[in-house]
Amino acid sequence: MQRSLVGSEMCIRDRVETDIEVDPEAELAGVYRHVGAGGTVMRPTKIDGPAMIFNNIKNHKDARVVIGLLASRERVARLMGCKKEELGKLLCRAALNPIEPVVSEEKAPCQEVIHKVTDPDFDLFKLFPAPTNTPMDAGPYITMGMCYATHPDTGCSDVTIHRMCIQSKDELSIFLQPGSRHIGVMAERATELGQPLPISISIGVDPAIEVGSCFEPPTTPLGYNELSIAGAIRKTPVVLAPCVSIKENAIANAEYVIEGEIQPGIRVVEDQNTHTGYAMPEFPGYNGLASHECWLIKVKAVTHRKNPIMQTVIGPSEEHVNLAGIPTEASIYNMLEKALPGKVTNVYAHQSGGGKYMAVLQCRKTVHTDEGKQRQAALLAFSAFPELKHVILVDEDVDIFDTRDVLWAMNTRFQGDRDIITIPGVRCHPLDPSSDPVYSQSISDKGISCKTIFDCTVPFELKDKFARAKFMDIDEEKWKDFI
């Protein structure tokens, strides 16, 4: 599916391609930083830049790499078939109306070429043009791998994205933050049973799968298969194929599939080959620290299409913002529609928070008893997405997707002594470098934060005094060449 999308008209109009040889070790990411990374990447970088295909990868003559396919919200919307302002609502509807995946016994496109670990020349370093994002990375990373596994007790399956570093010719490290992702729960249970957890890692799939896989509880609790969200978006089930070396399924249309087993009770140091102290750049814009508690995947086989396309993402890029942020919007909107129907008209997980730390809520006040519900909505948003740190509340006449308009509301409809609500001592996200006891005495542990609400809405009784200047409605057809 991804291969057809990469070559489609909807993507090709903002895609660049090069035959210049590129080194996957830091150079590839360094080039795309300028071409279109955006997000929380240090400036200069291009916002809403094109996707980029590298056709000539050093030491990987038969492979190509695509990056930035989802680095523009406008492009994501085209790929999903909706307006960019409606992406969160589309994902919300899909999560509420799932279509479960199906398993096909037909020959899968992802298995055109098969490499087994028993082959004498099997080597992950040679099979994958996996990039390192910076010279400080722990090694080459699989950053767009759809990790698929099944709970050993319940038989329920799950798909999630995790960072995975190639550690040897047949080993990957996988970072599973304790208690935060379903595959981590599955691996812990398999360890209790003293058995490995079979896992497939599909790379280069339909963007609907990639975005859908980034949902988190409580919207998608343990037992909810996020592949069903992609099925709902496409109105047809995601097709799976049985793996060739393990008892698990993989996404049939993937470009690459890694088949392996998470080893019970084994932990490895993420930067064991480089000793830099760092893993890779993460979504907040800083280098993530290397973990000393990564789980180990022993790889059994790699399958791929002929002339495969490797897909990758830069951790702090706009692509990651969209992957994380659109499901965040959907989760928040879903909860608010249930608790306060019609009182929040849209949600934007702002790029400056990496799609996780900050949300802008567009609020509707129609009667005087709506006053205060906007702050209730903010509290509910924190419950819908626990990693959220800041919520900005604005009125219906503010474009939440335009930062300048949001800051206009903050400058003209906000007073710091009455419109800031702080909630200290709440668990948030460990990758926020300011959520550390050395930063603030109010923080008792790494990952604890002060959640903050910025209420930039007009008090209901003052609405008439805050009406924006109205301009004359014009004949848009008459002036269509200019507007």
Predicted ranges, named:
Residues 1-7, 12:
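Single conserved hydrophobic/aromatic residue that forms the stacking wall/gate
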Residues 10, 214-217, 344:
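Accessory structured domains or lobes within enzymes
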Residues 13, 299, 410:
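A residue-level signal for conserved active-site and pocket-lining positions in enzyme catalytic cores
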Residues 14-15, 267-268, 308-309, 341-346, ...:
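Intrinsically disordered or highly flexible coil/loop and linker segments, enriched in small
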Residues 16-45, 54, 80-81, 85-296, ...:
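Conserved mixed alpha/beta core segments that line enzyme active sites in large multi-domain catalysts
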Residues 19-57, 61-73, 349-483:
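Membrane-interface helix/loop boundary segments of multi-pass membrane proteins
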Residues 148-153, 336-347, 374-381:
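Structured alpha-helical segments in the cores of large, soluble enzyme domains
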Residues 314-346, 352-366:
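Long, well-ordered mid-to-C-terminal structural blocks that present hydrophobic/aromatic surfaces
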